[in-house]
């Protein structure tokens, strides 16, 4: 994905950049292949192959939403050499960098849509029971700017 066009019922459109497009795919559960590029411990770019991603979106309280993403990845099959030794493992620091990369993509998607008053993750459907008819009348503008959004990423390496 290089860009994604998001449209609303009112006909507004917003073009998401590459990172935000991938973030949307992670939350929608539609990114089950491809790679995640990150900076390795040796300051070189490395990548892992995505095997599976699952996301559960939950609303906690009146204005806080959390996306919990579980990723299954595998190391790239091509080992790299460093100081004459074959290196094909992922350190804890590298796992954190992978988590930060995915989290950044998801947050970028939410923030771009929040600025445009678009509820990209359909958080309003989860808030409807709390807000009632006020939510129906002003679906996007009533609440989306007040939502605090966070993403928790869990990576499992095969």
At which residue positions do the language-model features occur?
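Membrane-proximal alpha-helical signals and transmembrane carboxylates
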Residues: 1-158
């Amino acid at each position: 994905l290089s860009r994604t066009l998001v449209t609303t019922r009112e006909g507004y459109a917003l073009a998401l950049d590459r990172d935000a497009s991938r973030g949307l795919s992670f939350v929608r559960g539609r990114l089950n292949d491809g790679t995640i590029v990150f900076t390795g411990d040796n300051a070189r770019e490395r990548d892992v192959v995505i095997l599976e991603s699952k996301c559960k979106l939950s609303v906690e309280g009146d204005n806080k939403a959390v996306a919990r993403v579980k990723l299954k990845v595998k190391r790239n099959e091509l080992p790299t050499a460093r100081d004459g030794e074959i290196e094909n493992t992922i350190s804890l620091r590298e796992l954190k960098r992978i988590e930060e990369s995915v989290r950044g993509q998801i947050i970028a998607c939410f923030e771009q849509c929040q600025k445009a008053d678009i509820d990209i993750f359909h958080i309003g459907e989860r808030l409807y029971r709390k807000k009632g008819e006020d939510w129906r009348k002003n679906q996007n503008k009533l609440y989306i700017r007040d939502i605090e959004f966070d993403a928790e990423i869990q990576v499992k390496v095969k």
